Amino acid sequence: MQSIENQVRERVARFLEVTSVSIPLMNAPMAEVSGPALTAAMCRAGGLGVLAGDELLPEALSNAIDEVRRLAGADARFAVNLRVPPAKAPTPEGIDCQRRMLAALEDLAADLGLEPNTIEELPDFDAQFDVLLEKHVPVVSVTFGGLREEYDERLKEAGIVWMGTATTLREAKVLRAAGADLVVVQGIEAGGPRLNFESSDDEAAVGMSVLTTHAARATRLPVIASGGIAESQQVYGALVAGASAVMVGSALLRTFESTASASFKNVLPLLTDVSMRLTRCFNGRLTRVYPSELVQALDEAGLTYAPYPLQREVMRPILRAAAQQGRDDLACLPAGQAAMLAREESVEAVAARLMSFVPI
């Protein structure tokens, strides 16, 4: 029987072979945080940097990819994350709910200088996808679902590796059937939006460790564990549980390369394990955040949030304007259960610390 260390070494080797990086570490594609600087820093540290591209229009996405290569080198191995568009069109009930949300937030929007009924739709997925092919990015990451056959075929023809994110064993199997080369599993501990697409919110409330073990056994693909990982012991535990690599998000929030606001970085050391909250106010999906005054006010008001992506369309202009005006009280502050463990250091230092127990 193989020793645990040899089993870990073999699993890690699979991830390194598929991605052509030197350490089994990725950053989470955190909107407004995982920009070119953080992505490139992860690449330089030996991991797979992941650019948060899902909110970028095609031209901005192309420029961001160019910037990653400028900072990390033309041959850098990195991924770009996009979000799969909803499979179903909005219902009349959902649209009515969106109208009520716009009315409820009318005064706030006006205070921020927004025109009445301002919404912001998701960028066009096909146009974004075309950019990734044109730029021949090494790895494509998708969230909120798997890729349809036509997209999988185009990536495979181009020799591009792709991965999806699962919150349950069923979703991991769906991604395997869709042709994914790697599967990220998002434990309930993770910050940001819950990424379930085939499973209900209740079904998707699975812890990282259990989900990692089941997904690795069932899919036989390299599995990347995410959710609540911020220390080297947790990294090794995830690898023992069956992961081939780990993805960290909140652990990088205070890094020099993170574009999180200074006020958010300063509050992180003061948090406890129960400081975060699950809310639907930002996008209609359960999202783990540190509750700003906006979150507290909206949740306590008892408003009925519009379903995803309609709620996101309402909130995106408000969040953008608030950020431009330095309104921290109106911020969206995604953070996982391990956010209080984040340290003020470089991405390279985080990577070295997290990899200290990993046999490579």
Where are these regions (language model features)?
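Conserved active-site-proximal phosphate/metal-binding subdomains
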Residues: 105-106, 193-224, 229-360
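Active-site entrance/lid segments in N-terminal catalytic domains of soluble metabolic enzymes
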Residues: 2-218
